[in-house]
Amino acid sequence: MENKIEILAPAGSMDSVIAAVRSGADAVYLGEKEFSARSSAHNFDENELKEAVRYCHIHSVKVYVTLNTIVFDDEMQRLKEAVLIAARADVDALIVQNMGVARLARQLVPSMHLHASTQMSVHSYLGVKALYEMGFERVVVSREMSKKELEKAAEIPVELEVFVHGALCMCVSGQCYFSAMLGSRSGNRGACAQPCRLPFSVGKVKDGHALSLKDNSIIPYITQLQEMGVASAKIEGRMKRPE
């Protein structure tokens, strides 16, 4: 029997967790107070995280926690605590951006499942294969991958997670420095100011939003994703309201 593709919903608050579960999500992803690529979301302290996991598990919904920002050396102790908080809350997996964070998580909690974040910029068969060989259970692939590239990557015995709805960045995930350059707010630290959404003059065009891409929506192709072996259909939007 063909496996049903997982519907993975975002949650920036407990209200969003409840909304996702009631709407039929198979899993939710959310961030702790630190090391989340959506630092402006409410996010979850230890008690809130435990409450969210308890509520989700009662309804047979999985919870994945994001630790997917660039991490500096002087933050290692807080990072260790973040990993242990997630483990104590009994989350189902960590979504990580940094290989050092992945190694640390393996050392602290060997049984923890690891998902490679889209911030790793995995956009090829070889990238997916490398992460599988490193022991990752799932890879969140770049939004830029084509159907042909996804089909090839799906041959590797690792779960693939694909964004099916949400905003598109002008740059490959994990590679954009636009916000950091213009306003000292790094998207790779969870603080993107989204300057690409502003109007710019380009050549003879003196106004317009040349760098602001239309939203991504491949929901009509979910059946095709399932047929090629994609494990999870991911909805972007931890900054969005519950409704």
Where are these regions (language model features)?
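Active-site pocket-lining/capping segments in soluble small-molecule metabolic enzymes
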Residues: 2-122, 140-144, 149-232, 239-243
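Anion-binding and metal-coordination hotspots
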Residues: 136
